[in-house]
């Protein structure tokens, strides 16, 4: 597939037989490439400067025992060999992200809504939800708080940050007016 910009420069796109984007050739001749595994998951990508990124996925156990995060991204290795690691809980939800010596932990409620993101020192953000899954409030470790109100159609009607409140109204097309 090819497309031309307003100045007549062409960008080319190549796909494999399964419809995965495998390369982009830019007007300046530089190329980005991507490779996929047999499950169509991205496993490598190389940017136009030649920087390669490798993506690694959790594989199923050999004995059929469930593995947290099975089939999900487990690591991204950048061109400079820095790696980001991902762990998952028993529901397959992301539970931690680690880069260098830093780790961020994520927690969820029974409805699988994200309720907490914090680093190893406990610094982070908390979310509270109503029974419909709407965010009621967001509270940071620094004490900043945002609250949200909703109408019967679950549309946000007000957002309060500190002492400032922004009210929202909607037209018949669901656009904010």
Which role fits each region the language model picked out?
Residues 1-5, 9-26, 30-47, 51-78, ...:
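Beta-strand elements of repeat-based all-beta scaffolds
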